[in-house]
Amino acid sequence: MSPLVTLDQATFRFSETGTLGPISWQIESGQKWFIAGRNGSGKSVLLGLIEGGGRIQSGQARGIPQNAVVVSAAAHLALIDRERHQYDGADDKFKGSSVADILSELNPVDKVLTELIRRFQLQPLLGQRFRQLSTGETKKVLFVRALAANCPLLILDEPLAGLDDGSREVAMDSLADFVGGKTVLLVLNDWAALPDWIDHVAYLSGGRIDYQGPMDPTAARSWLGQMVVLTNEAQALPAPLPSSVPGLS
């Protein structure tokens, strides 16, 4: 594997008062990372920085791609906001992008897109305007658009949020079938939903990565739960083992 992204003691400023880091982290092509940590630990901020936002204050950040595809609350709102601002006006002939237009924007792999449209039952929506869809429908479209995209890096920040139970199951099955050789960065607050195709974990605490390395998903579900308990109770964490998931008694 070759490095796709390298952070070397990088500290980022993401707001007037907020910083993240220092962080040293290497993401290699094809790796599937699960980003874990308590609420407020910096998971979403870190993914946003990998996407290309924020200003580096110190250290180095190399290889951050310009064509990462993102599923997140922020990406969802940005797409809705784009459609609203682009087409709100007196000229009624501009009614917004169709669902088919939205799905075709990111150079999709046609066979994958066709199958995902079938799985999520989006065919009746293709001719509708994106801005006219329900929240759940827009979430499905954003997910399908991202997974079908021909891109090297897929960033998934709570990708199941806003989906009904049936669509969540379809989404997880589709990820297992179609992530393929893509590099994936995934945040899920539900440890039980951690997919079997994940092969690495990074655990954040206080804006820093405390643990990173290869992992077995089955062992990791228990390990991550114990890490959260230890952090919540302010207990001393075990010594980092960067090359493997540490076993906790």
Predicted regions mapped to residue ranges:
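ABC ATPase nucleotide-binding domain signature region
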Residues: S44-N107
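Walker B catalytic motif
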Residues: R129, E158-P159
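Conserved H-loop
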Residues: D190-D196
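Conserved ABC ATPase "signature" region
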Residues: P108-L125
